[in-house]
């Protein structure tokens, strides 16, 4: 029996704007054009990011039998022989039951056709990440392997599916209660420090 255990939401506009500026900086460092197009002034950048934010759609399953919720890119981008990775602030977070996590995996078609993968191979979004300093903002870092597609560039349009989120349950060890746990305060990657 399938249970309803989670709810996708958008992060605040302010969080999305902060993370988009970081992603734009990273993309330009690896040779990409600005994710903000020809916007130059702060006001133009805010307006461009507001448009992206307003168009973010919450993840959905394509069919009744689909396990994955399609996560879409909020902006256009290109990956090719020169630009091999990108950080994508999705604008999303996920509130879920304590004994679940959200697994983030690449869309299989993009993996087969373009060698697209997540930089960390699989994303794990813990249930307590929802309350992190960055509002639990789910971000995908995608990498592109041109040798797998004969150098064909991957051109992604805003709204195109880039990854999938799959809700999974997990167990704990019998002696787990003996280990002192920390409370999550940081954002992305903060519990491994």
Where in this protein do the model-derived segments appear?
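DUTPase catalytic domain/fold
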Residues: 1-193
């Amino acid at each position: 029996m399938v249970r309803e255990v989670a709810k996708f939401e958008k992060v605040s506009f302010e969080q999305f704007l902060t993370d988009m500026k970081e992603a734009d900086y990273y993309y330009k460092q690896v040779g990409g054009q600005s994710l903000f197009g020809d916007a130059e002034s702060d006001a133009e950048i805010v307006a461009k990011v507001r448009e992206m934010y307003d168009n973010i759609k919450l993840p959905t399953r394509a069919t009744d039998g689909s396990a994955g919720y399609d996560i879409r890119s909020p902006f256009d981008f290109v990956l090719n022989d020169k630009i091999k990775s990108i950080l994508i602030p999705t604008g999303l977070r996920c509130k879920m039951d304590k004994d679940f996590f959200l697994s983030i995996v690449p869309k299989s078609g993009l993996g087969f056709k373009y060698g697209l993968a997540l930089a960390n191979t699989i994303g794990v979004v813990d249930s307590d990440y929802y309350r992190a300093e960055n509002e639990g903002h789910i971000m995908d870092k995608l990498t592109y392997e041109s040798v797998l597609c004969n150098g064909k560039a991957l051109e992604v349009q805003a709204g195109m599916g880039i990854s999938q989120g799959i809700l999974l349950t997990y167990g704990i060890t019998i002696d787990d209660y003996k280990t002192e746990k920390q409370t999550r305060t940081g954002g992305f990657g903060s519990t491994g420090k």
